[in-house]
Amino acid sequence: LAKRLAEYGGCYVVLIHPNVTKEKIEFLNAVVPELKRFAWFGTLQQFGDWWTMRDGVSVDARIFEDEMVITVDSELPIQGLRLDLDTDWIPQSPLPDGVSFSPGSVYIAAAGTELSITMNMPEMDR
């Protein structure tokens, strides 16, 4: 289940109560090394911060002839946000500081609360 959820960025929560510790510790000792290969581990505070940021982000994409302008608006400064894109789309101009591109995605490591990126679109996508 955790692998299937990871494929689309889902959340896998393990909640353990301390009433029967031996079996639960054994479970954690077995599952954590397997999950670490592809999962992020965080505290409840980190998860809450992530959820608050996720809930406050909106993305708008507008097509103008041979380009697409992607605008990201956020209630909080944007940190650690990945946008999955068509692998043929390429940024038209240099990206702002804190933003990186690889085919199929734009990663926003750190930005303010609004960011626009102009992408070249192949003719077949228009």
Regions found by a protein language model. Give the residues of each.
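C-terminal beta-sandwich/jelly-roll accessory domains of carbohydrate-active enzymes
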Residues: 56-126
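Proline/serine/threonine-rich low-complexity linkers at boundaries of modular beta-sandwich domains
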Residues: 47-56
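Short C-terminal domain-edge/linker segments immediately following a structured domain
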Residues: 43-48, 99-103
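A residue-identity detector for tryptophan
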Residues: 40, 50-51, 89
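A structural signal for short secondary-structure junctions
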Residues: 4-8, 34, 51-52, 62-66, ...
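Catalytic grooves of carbohydrate-active enzymes
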Residues: 1-47
